[in-house]
Amino acid sequence: MPSKPTKTLPGATDRRIDALLALLSENSTIVISGAQIAKEIGVSRQQVFRWIETLRALGVKVKGHPRAGYHIERAPDILAPQLLARRLRGTAFSKRIHHFFKAESTNTIAMHLGEAGEAHGTVVLAEEQTAGRGRAGRTWLTEKSAGISCTVLVRPPIPPAHAPLLTLVAGLATRDAVADELPSVPDIRWPNDLLVHRRKFCGILTEMHAEPDRLRYAVIGIGINVNQSKMPGEIEDIATSLRIESGKMHSRLEILIRLLRHLDRYYNLYLAEGAAPILRRFAEVSSYFRGKRVRITTPRERFTGVTAGLESSGVLRVVRDDGLGTEAILSGDVAEAD
């Protein structure tokens, strides 16, 4: 059984900063007195200025009014836990949200929380991620306040062999969350990439701790390129962002709220009805589901073939070009064949 939740994590955003940010953001059109701020965030009136200065040091523009109070000049695009929790009520993801302004890897933090017994639905967020992990040991970096680095901890009652479906669930949720932000229809490349114009803007990494017959917990890491104005030269031909594609800035907070709502919906659909509705939806929105010529790279070989749907566990089936039959791809890199 899960133990008591971890209350404070080293490096996590102080709850008073979170409360102050939420208070100012939700009352951005009025001046709030120092006395009210002190009462709301649980500090003395003498300490209010210090916390305002801490917020300013994080890049939040707060204007002071002598003998009147403070107001926020422009609501910042920060993934503040209190703002998220209020908008996520009724979902599994509203109660335990750990926020970091800078972290190495949200997946690593979530794995530690899973081992410590943290409850299903725990969310870990980072404004900047310096050592995020992608599949096959690749690095996924998140530029400060430009992307979304989000990991959720789940404890589904499913066998380990069905864990690939969790990645599909996350991919569908992410696609639904960003579809209206893009001028072109996004695609899902099995199992974990979201593309637009064949360039990647989102990656998903699912990791788990399992016993032979049961999955103890899984962490689903989702990284989205949102407001990057350009990509590094070495990946600019294969990667993109919502801003690059749309030509405008996007609210990371609103995208994340939609993402977690959709994730809650798809996750509950999967638990209630099994794999069938997830596979049907994937078939509707992914060009990689069937009939796509692909190049497969696994630790033991490379080959080309044509996709032939998914098995009930979420594994991809590929008819090989070399005549060796149909291969079930549990893991490996999938790319569109030239």
Predicted feature locations:
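Short, ordered beta-strand-loop transition motifs
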Residues: 63-66, 189, 310
